[in-house]
């Protein structure tokens, strides 16, 4: 499919750090900030796909040293972070053939300046794990550094959340993206840039808000990450779980609202348990999937 101009500048791959020496545990980051408040200028929560999908509040379990695009002379003025990167990252980067990464060893290999510019005015952004069986987007606070294993959407729109959480988006992604084992390997250029998005409607805004609020409450109350929660949603043996039934109902409403926004009133979605890509999922039926991508 053709890449669409209206979708450009929205979906980005996160930052490619390249060097475990940049990464700190939460306690050490807080100790460094307590030792010198200026360190807060270069220390940030660091979120990867595993944390996003496994932690009930989708929060980062680690922090990262991020000098941004600062020159070396300025990076030196943050002694603790600089010393860590000097001793742990520089020796590894010295072995690299790519000159920029070797010579600018105190910087991320890919800092994602376009992503940062696109999200600079937002208090939160939508993210999706790049490799995932769940393939569900969630909002996170802006200011968290996303790893290159996250896809970031420069938007705080609840209607876009609904669109990305819909079966239409999932079926499109499965058709046009790669796979890693049975998991979806999401490529923004192949999936989001080519996806003809529906008209934004009030119904999509409203059901996107419902999904965001109710799913978050269920995850926190039951101490479940996205992967474990959606494993329950896709488990045909689970028939009498009110939270799971509610989440399935929300996704039916999301799909109905999305199809309506596209103007596809004649598609019978046939929600239920269907075999898809060698696994059983709670999703739309085979005939609906064919109509969606045709």
Residues covered by each model-derived region:
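S-adenosyl-L-methionine
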Residues: 1-294
